[in-house]
Amino acid sequence: MDCRIKSGNDERACHLRPYAPADEDAAIALWLVTWQATYPQFDFAGRLDWWRAHWRRLAQAAKIVVATGAGEAMIGFVTIEPHTHYLDQLVVAPDHWGKAVAAALMTEAKRLCADFIDLDVKTDNARALGFYKKHGFTVTGDGINEFSGRPIFHMRWRAGA
């Protein structure tokens, strides 16, 4: 599936495709750079062993869609578990923030789970909160992330709402 990357008056093609096991290292590297840009005060490099194990569990249970740009470099991905409708990760390279890559990945997630999608987002992640609200998600509750201990919002998108 093709998508468009927008930057001012410039538009470039991107491509959405299913994840392949050969993508693992690129996905893990992209996760690291993206989360470090979002929360520079935290040591995400120190969490790489945890993340690799988590990623491998996701790869078994979830549908993963990868966004690629020029030269087929990975610029984003979304993971969604079709049985639970849980969106675990929506990651876009910082230099592609605001350029419609996340929107294309969200559209694909909604296609894969057309009834509803649940997710958790850190309460202080204003960029993500704004994005999810723009795409029809509403806050359904709050809690604490069991890994980080940080406060989160539970959010849901429901088709037709």
Language model features with spans:
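Intrinsically disordered, low-complexity, positively biased terminal segments
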Residues: 1-7, 94, 107, 112-114, ...
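Short hydrophobic/aromatic beta-strand or adjacent loop that forms the aromatic wall/cage
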Residues: 62, 149-155
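Active-site acidic-Proline motif in GNAT/NAT acetyltransferases
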Residues: 93-95, 99, 123-124
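Conserved N-terminal entry element of GNAT/NAT acetyltransferase domains
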Residues: 1-22, 157, 161
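Conserved GNAT acetyl-CoA-binding A-motif
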Residues: 112-124
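Acetyl-CoA-dependent GNAT
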Residues: 18-95, 106-108, 112
